A protein has these predicted regions:
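Gly/Ser/Thr-enriched, mixed-charge loops and adjacent short helices
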Residues: 15, 31-40, 148-276, 282
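Conserved phosphate/anionic-ligand binding catalytic regions in large, soluble enzymes, centered on
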Residues: 36-56, 141, 228-240, 295, ...
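N-terminal small/polar loop signature for handling phosphorylated ligands or for N-terminal nucleophile
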Residues: 84-147, 242, 247-302
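Short acidic, glycine/serine/threonine-rich loops at helix termini
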Residues: 94-99, 124-127, 146-152, 180, ...
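Phosphate-binding and adjacent anionic-ligand microenvironments
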Residues: 283, 287-289, 309, 329, ...
């Protein structure tokens, strides 16, 4: 069917939801194209899209169809342990969770649904804790209020890898019904929908408490500000900090769950606007650090008071500090395993890797997306050859202990608070700790530059851009020689004029250029947002040196994409 045929099918559907019908009636040609040119697709972190009418939107029909695909796969595999379901604070989240449970029940599959919003890491934990076959998380993470999303987890509490997602997509594509209606359940089927017991909350909180390395540290003379950005994390974080005894000031205007994110300029911890109100609180109460989680509670942002000013740390910087703290403390206590392994992604800074290697910890790289890290953890657990000690990615996601198989903002909050308190007791800040790492391992600066390209035109342009870069391999970047090039789509490495196969990764549209000065640049179209991204890991002799290089590299990129 073409776009107009799809549109008319939706418009004339007799059972179409009234709000979706009104949206369809008001669409112009451009809006029709964007809503129907493709079906909603699974990207880096599940299916994430703008709420609304159409095949390329998140609505009850696309949610039901996705869940039907999952149900078909589970029944084909004779799975009988059910599916855990949680949801965040967004518009339609409760309805999407309920509809997912009903579809599963219509296929004879049990579900365990939370009665109110919970964080993404707790959903991952719940799948494992209740020995479920799968999990569904209704969330769009840090995206704007117009979005929602649908993430599927496997029996290990890990987001589905492309191979497993492919099975669900194949099942969806074979569904005969164009519109999946709400099923009319029998009494027996209704009994398959269960509410998750409150005891799971306490079990999860108690597990998170085990990430502390120095719980005996005095909490005196240490204060922090925390905001959940109107999302899911407030109850869990408050429970943790109350148990541990930190002096916490909560940003009250942002503690209530709110799908409109009314009192935050941006709910994304990567964006400085997310900290505006929290920093006002911090200045008033003279807090040592500011912590913020994103709406679904898997990612964490940090600001540190240093020399009288609050400094925002990037995910790479925070990751480096945590790595050094965790590994040094474990080494001191004799609890760092001999076969320790750390995971990070191909667009994460080299600094963390250098620190890990100094402690004898091996490092394995994955593609972007914590699903790959979760999968690696499981592979090594099966082989019993390596012991997980840390996993992280540049986009503010960290995992300290693997009772969760996704990034965990709750674990991160607790450990970073302890880390900051530890350094304060030594008359240091986390910035001082970071500067010591630069002195030891070299100065690094990591940053990102993105082009926002929306709709069908934007998607086509992004594909043309990546193909253009792929077909015209750069031999130098802003005057610096490219000494190695990796194409994760074609799975090749070119070094010293020699082409080799790039193994150990699924195919992905990522290109990476390694420069003679130890820096690298990676480019990829985002799998969760309409953005074409450039990642920079810049190595130099000093802060002035890396800042000058960054300016030069940015100008070069601007010229490339004109």
């Amino acid at each position: 069917m073409n776009i107009e045929e799809k549109y008319l099918l939706w418009l004339n559907h007799p059972n179409m939801d009234q709000d979706l019908k009104e949206e369809l009636v008001s669409m112009d040609e451009k809006q029709k194209e964007d809503a129907f040119y493709v079906d909603a697709q699974f990207g880096t972190a599940g299916m994430r899209n703008i709420l609304g009418a159409g095949t390329n939107r998140l609505n009850v029909y696309t949610i039901r169809k996705a869940t039907m695909g999952l149900a078909i796969v589970l029944n084909k595999l004779n799975k009988s342990n059910g599916v855990a379901i949680a949801y965040d604070n967004r518009y339609k989240s409760v309805e999407f969770a309920q509809q997912s449970a009903k579809i599963l029940a219509s296929y004879g599959i049990k579900s365990y649904v939370y009665d109110s919003l919970r964080t993404t890491p707790q959903l991952s934990y719940t799948v494992r804790h209740l020995h479920c076959d799968a999990g569904i998380m209704i969330t769009a993470s840090h995206n704007g209020k117009e979005y929602n999303g649908y993430k599927i987890y496997d029996e290990n509490g890990c987001q589905l890898t492309p191979e497993k997602v492919g099975e669900v997509i194949d099942a969806i594509n074979n569904i005969k019904q164009y519109f999946v209606e709400e099923p009319k359940l029998t009494l027996q089927q209704e009994k398959l929908i269960n509410t998750v017991d409150k005891s799971v909350d306490e079990d999860y909180i108690n597990e998170v408490l085990t990430v502390q390395l120095n719980p005996q540290l005095s909490k005196d003379n240490f204060k922090l500000v925390y905001t959940p950005q109107h999302g899911t994390s407030y109850k869990a974080i408050k429970a943790l900090f109350d148990k541990v005894g930190y002096d916490v000031v909560y940003v009250k205007e942002q503690c209530n769950p709110d799908p409109a994110f009314s009192n935050t300029l941006c709910p994304n911890p990567e964006d400085p606007r997310a900290y505006v109100l929290a920093l006002e609180y911090a200045k008033q109460c003279d807090a040592d650090i500011v912590l913020t989680t994103d709406p679904d509670g898997d990612r964490l942002g940090l600001a540190v008071k240093h020399d009288g000013q609050y400094v925002l740390l990037s995910g790479n910087q925070t990751g480096a500090i945590i790595i050094d703290y965790v590994f040094s403390q474990n080494k001191l206590k004799g609890t760092l395993p001999e076969n320790a392994v750390m995971f990070n992604t191909v667009v994460t800074s080299d600094l963390g890797e250098r620190i890990a290697q100094n402690y004898g910890v091996s490092v394995e790289k994955t593609l972007t997306g914590f699903k790959y890290i979760g999968d690696k953890i499981e592979q090594h657990n099966i082989k019993k050859d390596k012991t997980f000690v840390f996993g992280y990615e540049e986009s503010y996601g960290y995992l300290i202990k693997d009772f969760v198989r996704d990034k965990d903002g709750n674990q991160s909050c607790l450990l970073i608070a302890e880390c900051a308190n530890y350094y304060k007791k030594k008359s240091m800040t986390m910035i001082d700790a970071l500067n010591q790492l630069y002195q030891k391992y070299g100065t690094y600066r990591e940053s990102q530059k993105s082009l926002t390209l929306t709709g069908a035109d934007g998607k086509e342009k992004m594909q043309k851009m990546i193909e253009s870069f792929r077909n015209n391999i750069l031999s130098e970047f802003a005057g610096e020689k490219v000494v190695k090039y990796q194409d994760f789509g074609l799975r090749i490495t070119i070094e010293n004029g020699e082409k080799k196969e790039l193994t150990g990764f699924d195919k992905s549209d990522v290109l990476k250029y390694f420069l003679a000065d130890g820096s690298w640049i990676a480019i990829r179209p985002s799998g969760t947002e309409p953005k074409f991204k450039f990642y920079f890991c810049i190595k130099g002799d000093s802060q002035n040196d890396v800042l000058a290089k960054e300016k030069k590299y940015y100008q070069f990129v601007d010229e490339l994409v004109k």
